[in-house]
C-alpha cells in the first residue's frame, strides 16, 4: 500500500504528464510554423525576387513590415495579444484564453521576421492560460496556482529539452515545510517537465552546446578571471536595464501600437544591417554560426554583442511578443568570445560561460537558471565549481539593483491605450 503522501503526489501525475506533452506540442507547432514562414521571408521570397537575403533594404523592409504586422495584431485582436512582456516576469498570472490567438500570431510573426526575442515568455503564457482554463473545468478542486506551476514546468522542460532547468527554478519557489517536503511539491512539476522534454526530444533536440575548447583543470587565477568576465557582462546588462524603461516610455507616447512597433521594426532593421544576418532572430542558431565563423575578430564580436543587446532592448521596449533569455545568451557568447580574443590566456570556456552567467543573471535575476544556461552552452563538468564560485560576487553586484522590467504602474503597454 502506498503512503498517503505518495497517493497525494500521484493525484496530479496524469494531469502533469498531459500538460507537459501538450506544452511541448504547442511549442513545436509554433516553432514549426515560424520556421516555415522564416524560410519563406528570408530564403524563397528574396530568391524569387532576385534580391540578396542580406540586402540592407530587404532586412529593413522585412523587419519594418514585421513590426507593422505585429502592431496590427496587437491593435485589433481580441485581448490585444496578451500583456506586454516588458512589464511581465517570465512566469506570470493566467490571461484570458480569448487573447491567445493574437498572442500566438504575434509571436510567430516576430520569430519569423527576425526580431531579437525568443519564444519563452509567450509560450509559457499560452500554456498557463490553457492549463488553467481547461484544468478549472476538469478538476475544479485544484487551484489555479497548481495549474500555473505545471504548465510553466512543462514548457520549461520542452524549451530546454531537459527537466533539469525546471527542477532548479522551482526548487527556489516551491518552499517545503515540516508537513510537505520540497520534493513532494516538486514531484508533479518534474513529471510535467520530464514529459515536455521527452516529447520535444521525439521531434527535435534543442542544441545549446557550443564547440569550445575543453577546459582542463581549475586554477585560482581562473576564478578571478571568471569573476571579472561576469562583472563585465553584468555591467553591459545593467546598461540595457537602464535603457529599457526609458525607451519604453518614449516609444509608447505614440499610444498606437502599429506606429510603435513599425518604428521599432525599422530600428531593428537598421541594427540588423549593421550587425548582419547573424545578429537577427532569437540567437540560438546564430550563436552556432558565430562560433563556427573563424573570420570574426575582437571588434566583430564586440559589435555583435552591442548590436544584439541594443536589438533586445528595442524589441522589448517596442512591445514585440517574445522572451529575453535566448538573445541574452547570444550576447553572453559574443562577449565571451570577444574577451577571449582580447586576452587569449583566459580559456574561451571560462570567458563564454561566465559572460553567459552574468548577462542571464541580469535579465532573469535567477541564479539557478543562469548557472544552467552557462553549463549547457559550455558543457564541461570542470567548470561547474568555478561557475558556482563566480556566481557569488555576481550575485552581490546585483543585490538591490533594478530588474530588466518596466514598472507597470508607470508604463502602460500599448494595448491598454486603445
UniProtKB/Swiss-Prot annotation:
A UniProt-annotated Pfam family: Voltage_CLC
Keywords assigned: Cell membrane, Ion channel, Ion transport, Membrane, Transmembrane, Transmembrane helix, Transport
Protein name: Putative ion-transport protein YfeO
Protein location: Cell membrane
GO cellular component, one term: plasma membrane
InterPro entries attached to this UniProt entry: Chloride_channel_YfeO, Cl-channel_core, ClC, ClC-type_chloride_channel
Chain segments annotated as transmembrane: 9-31, 55-77, 90-112, 122-140, 147-169, 189-211, 223-244, 259-281, 301-323, 343-363, 376-398
Organism: Escherichia coli O6:H1 (strain CFT073 / ATCC 700928 / UPEC)
Similarity field: Belongs to the chloride channel (TC 2.A.49) family.
GO function terms (MF aspect): chloride transmembrane transporter activity; monoatomic ion channel activity
Source organism superkingdom: Bacteria
Membrane topology label: Multi-pass membrane protein
Amino acid at each position: 500500500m502506498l503512503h498517503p503522501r505518495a497517493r497525494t503526489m500521484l493525484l496530479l501525475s496524469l494531469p502533469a504528464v498531459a500538460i507537459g506533452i501538450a506544452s511541448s506540442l504547442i511549442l513545436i507547432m509554433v516553432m514549426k510554423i515560424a520556421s516555415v514562414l522564416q524560410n519563406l521571408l528570408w530564403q524563397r521570397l528574396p530568391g524569387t525576387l532576385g534580391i540578396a537575403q542580406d540586402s540592407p533594404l530587404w532586412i529593413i523592409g522585412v523587419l519594418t513590415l514585421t513590426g507593422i504586422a505585429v502592431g496590427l495584431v496587437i491593435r485589433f485582436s481580441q485581448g490585444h495579444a496578451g500583456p506586454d512582456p516588458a512589464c511581465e516576469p517570465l512566469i506570470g498570472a493566467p490571461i484570458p484564453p480569448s487573447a491567445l490567438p493574437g498572442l500566438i500570431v504575434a509571436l510567430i510573426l516576430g520569430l519569423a521576421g527576425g526580431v531579437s526575442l525568443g519564444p519563452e515568455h509567450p509560450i509559457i503564457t499560452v500554456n498557463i492560460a490553457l492549463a488553467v482554463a481547461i484544468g478549472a473545468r476538469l478538476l475544479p478542486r485544484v487551484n489555479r496556482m497548481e495549474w500555473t506551476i505545471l504548465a510553466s514546468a512543462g514548457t520549461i522542460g520542452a524549451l530546454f529539452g531537459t527537466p533539469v532547468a525546471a527542477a532548479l527554478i522551482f526548487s527556489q519557489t516551491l518552499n517545503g515545510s515540516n508537513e510537505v517536503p520540497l520534493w513532494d511539491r516538486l514531484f508533479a512539476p518534474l513529471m510535467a517537465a520530464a514529459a515536455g522534454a521527452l516529447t520535444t526530444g521525439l521531434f527535435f533536440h534543442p542544441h545549446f552546446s557550443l564547440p569550445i575548447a575543453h577546459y582542463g583543470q581549475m586554477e585560482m587565477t581562473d576564478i578571478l578571471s571568471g569573476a571579472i568576465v561576469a562583472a563585465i557582462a553584468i555591467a553591459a546588462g545593467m546598461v540595457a536595464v537602464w535603457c529599457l524603461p526609458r525607451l519604453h516610455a518614449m516609444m509608447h507616447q505614440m499610444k498606437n501600437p502599429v506606429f510603435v512597433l513599425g518604428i521599432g521594426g525599422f530600428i531593428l532593421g537598421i541594427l540588423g544591417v549593421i550587425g548582419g544576418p547573424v545578429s537577427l532572430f532569437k540567437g540560438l542558431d546564430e550563436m552556432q554560426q558565430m562560433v563556427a565563423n573563424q573570420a570574426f575578430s575582437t571588434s566583430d564580436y564586440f559589435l555583435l554583442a552591442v548590436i544584439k543587446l541594443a536589438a533586445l532592448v528595442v524589441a522589448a521596449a517596442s512591445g514585440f511578443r517574445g522572451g529575453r533569455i535566448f538573445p541574452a545568451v547570444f550576447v553572453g557568447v559574443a562577449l565571451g568570445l570577444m574577451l577571449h580574443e582580447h586576452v587569449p590566456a583566459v580559456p574561451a570556456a571560462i570567458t563564454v560561460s561566465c559572460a553567459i552567467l552574468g548577462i542571464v543573471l541580469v535579465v532573469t535575476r535567477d541564479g539557478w537558471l543562469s548557472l544552467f544556461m552557462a553549463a549547457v552552452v559550455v558543457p564541461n563538468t570542470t567548470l561547474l565549481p568555478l561557475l558556482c564560485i563566480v556566481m557569488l560576487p555576481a550575485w552581490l553586484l546585483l543585490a538591490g539593483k533594478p530588474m530588466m522590467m518596466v514598472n507597470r504602474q508607470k508604463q502602460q503597454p500599448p494595448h491598454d491605450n486603445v
